[in-house]
Amino acid sequence: GLPARGRGDGPDAAGNRRSVTLPEITVDTRPTQLFITLDRRTVSPNGDGRDDALQIGTITRRTDGAQSAELRIIDATGATVRRFPLDAVEADATILWNGEPDGERPAETAPDGVYTVEYRVTYDNGAVPVATSPSITLDTQGPSLGVDLQGLPFSPDNDGLNDELGIALTVEDISDIESWEFEILDRNRRAFQRFSGTGRPGARLLWDGRSSDGELVISAEDYPYRFTAVDNTGNASTIEGEIPIDILVVRDGNLLKVQISNINFAPNSPVLELDPDTPTGAKNIAVLDRLVEVFDKYRSYEIRVEGHAVNISGTDREEQDELQPLSTARAETVRAALIERGMDGGRIDTLGRGGQAPIVPHTDLDNRWKNRRVEFILLR
C-alpha cells in the first residue's frame, strides 16, 4: 500500500473559506491470491481406516493485513455444511475434515454426495478473496447392486434352447468401482464358478453351466450366487440369489439320461415329501411335474428310473441290507408319482443301484451328496 496525505479547502456554511488537512490514508491494491490443495478427491469417513478423512491445505500469498479467515465445506445446493474459523491467517495451513457437519451431534456424518471446499480471507482494506476447490465426493455406502438372469429356465444340455445363461449385472455408486466378483456356489456353498474384474462389470456375462473344472450343473438344482462390488473408497456391497436349473437331458455315451440330486425323501425312507406348503414338498412337486413335461417330448423312449445312494460305512452289509432295498423302493415311489401325473406306466421300469455307481468317492465328504440321486435313463 502507498501512504498519502490530502488537503481540501472550500467555503463553509457562512461563506468563509477554510482549509482542512486530511489524515494519512493508505491505498492498498495488492493482489491477494489464495489456493486450496486436497490430498484426495474422495473421502469415506466410515471408520474402516481407508480414506476416512480429507486433508485440506490452504495457501495464502499475503498474510499482512489479513484480519480473519474461514474454511467452508459446501454441498451441491450451495449450503454450508461445515465451517472452520481460523484464528490466525498463516501462509500455509492444514485442516482435516472427517465428514462431520456443524451441529450439536458432531459424531454424525454429512450425507453422501458431491461437495466443494471454499477458503476466504478478510483483509483490513475490505477485500475478501475466495478460493474454491475442485469437487470432492463423500461416500460412506457400498454400491447398489442388481442381477437379472436372462434365458430361464436354464438348461445347458446342447438342445439349442436356453443353453447359455445371460447374467446382467448393474452397479450404481457415486464413486468409481474398484472391483467386482460374481460367484456361483453349490448347495454346500462351495465355489462352483467365478467371474471377476476391475472397474465396472460389462453389460452381460454368459455362463455355459459348467464349473471352473468343467463339471456340468445338475438337473433341478438351485445354485446360489453371490455378487459383490467394491468402490474405490473400499465400501463393499453383496447381494445373493439363486440360479434355478431346468431338467437336463444329457448324452452319456450312447444313452440319454436325466440325473437329479434334488428329489428329496424322508430320512432312510422311500416316502416322498409332497406337501405343497413346505419348501421341500413344493420343490419335489415342481420337479416331478417338469419331468412329465420333458419326457412327453421323448415319447418313443422308455424310461428306467434308477435309485442311487451313499454307502457311508463302505461295507457290503450296508450295501446289501440297506442301500439296495432303499434305492429300489425310492425308484418305485418316483415311478408311481410319474404315473399319477399321467405318464404311461408301461414305459417306466425301475432299478435300485444302491451305492454301486457313485459319481464321486463315498469318502468325499464335501461332494458325496451328489451320489444320493435319482437317474432317468431313456431307452429305445
Question: Which stretches of residues belong to each language-model region?
Answer:
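Conserved structural position at the C-terminal beta-strand
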Residues: 8-10, 119-121, 227-229, 378
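Extracellular acidic, Ser/Thr/Pro-rich low-complexity tracts
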Residues: 10-12, 58-65, 101, 123, ...
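Periplasmic OmpA-like peptidoglycan-binding domain that tethers envelope proteins to the cell wall
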Residues: 275, 308-380
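Glycine-centered tight-turn motifs at strand-turn-strand junctions
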Residues: 1, 80-109, 191-217
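Extracellular Ig-like/FN3 beta-sandwich strand-entry sites
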Residues: 3-5, 66, 112-116, 177, ...
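Periplasmic peptidoglycan-binding/tethering modules of Gram-negative envelope proteins
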Residues: 28-44, 132-181, 193-201, 206, ...
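Acidic, glycine-anchored loop motifs typical of Ca2+
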Residues: 42-53, 99-107, 113, 153-164, ...
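Short, solvent-exposed loop/turn segments at the edges of extracellular beta-sandwich modules
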Residues: 11-16, 104, 122-127, 212-214, ...
